[in-house]
Amino acid sequence: RILPVIGQGNHNAQIMFIGEAPGANEDKTGVPFCGRAGEILNLLLTSVGIKREDVYIANILKDRPPANRKPATEEITACTAYLLRQIAIIEPKIIATLGNYATHFILEKFGVPDSQLGISRLRGKKFPVQDPTTQNPYIIIPLYHPAVAVYNSRSLDELKSDFKIIGEQLKSAGDNL
């Protein structure tokens, strides 16, 4: 571990993006989504008229797992309270989960049935939830992780389509960033 990656963005954001864990670039800079996946995330945000500085970005884990392995249960446990506190402080209207792992984790934390379905079945759907502790309402929208487009350029169109759902949700709520 070089630097912890706590999170970054607007503390009054209407949208909070949550990924799994920092990668190598993030570990070096302390900035979430600053590598190739971050470039794609920026492109996707721009495609729906959202500025990166208007959102908040975090990961479940705050440190990169060694050798990019899946997070261990102990690591998740150590970071869960911090992430839930970040969500409560930011109070976003939308929580956009990036990838299978973050989607399963967040949907399960908020008690959503079928939270273990694959991301291809959950992506782009809206799950209205309420935080049992703070009573804050959120809409969770699972999305493919932007890194998918690094390995499969055809998936960029699916990602853009999913990001349109976020833009539409903001407009329907009367919130323009």
Task: Locate the predicted segments by residue.
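A polyanion-binding, active-site-adjacent surface
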Residues: 1-177
